[in-house]
A protein has these predicted regions:
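Adenine nucleotide-associated cytosolic modules
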Residues: 1-233
């Protein structure tokens, strides 16, 4: 794969935490014309074990700004835009995503994950989803009209957030693994090559060293399989 000939375009990265750091680091080696990073959070001491682009000197700074600085230092000729905002509605996400080739959801909450899913369904753009908690991770690539989405799999977000990295912890190296795999999915979409994780949920059990691609079947009644512009239930 030649970086000089690959016709890549922009990427929207939602979330600048552990997954977002790993994704951004992996993408920095690609000839992407622009990267948009959206996150409203600031760097805390408890983040450093898994958010590998941050140091003690960065405490209190915005995560999105710090990743942009690191990314820009490696690729100063590329465009990096930061949004100090939490994109947690389909409308807010779609407004930014429609200008990019691929959207990557590296968020850490169900509201944003399903908002990204619903925006992708409604506006028909490709979405890479990933999550990690404790010693387990998961990965799914969504192509509305062609593959299953989060609502096909889970129906909708839970009523409460429940287990999070803040209250349950997460293995830093697992976050890195999931983030790099998310970047690899974005590469497949941008280069239009390989076999993205359409209709397959990749699960990772770090404790047992197991990966499993679980086959998925799209829900024929889900909005992702209906006409463009359809709204999720």
């Amino acid at each position: 794969m030649s970086a000089s000939t690959a016709p890549l375009d922009g990427v929207l990265l939602i979330g600048a935490g552990g997954l977002g750091c790993a994704v951004a680091l992996a993408l920095a080696g690609l000839p992407i014309t622009r990267l948009v990073i959206a996150d409203d959070d600031r760097i805390a001491l408890s983040n450093l074990h898994r958010q590998i682009l941050f140091t003690m000197r960065d405490l209190g700074a915005f995560k999105s700004d710090t990743i942009a600085m690191r990314w820009g230092a490696q690729r100063p000729d590329w465009s990096v835009t930061t949004l100090r905002a939490r994109l947690d509605t389909p409308e807010a996400i779609a407004e930014v995503a429609r200008h990019q080739a691929v959207t990557i959801d590296a968020s850490d909450n169900f509201a944003t994950r399903f908002a990204a899913n619903d925006a992708a369904i409604r506006h028909r753009f490709p979405l890479v989803h990933g999550a990690a908690i404790g010693l387990t991770g998961q990965l799914l690539t969504i192509d509305p009209g062609r593959s299953a989405c989060l609502r096909c799999l889970f129906g909708g977000p839970p009523e409460a957030e429940g287990t999070t990295c803040q209250n349950a912890g997460v293995l830093g190296s697992l976050v890195g693994e999931v983030g790099w795999l998310m970047a690899l999915e974005a590469v497949k979409l941008l280069y239009r090559t390989g076999r993205p994780l359409w209709n397959r949920l990749l699960t990772i059990d770090a404790l047992r060293g197991r990966r499993r691609a679980v086959p998925l079947r799209p829900d024929s009644h889900c909005a992702c399989q209906l006409q463009p512009g359809s709204d999720p239930p």
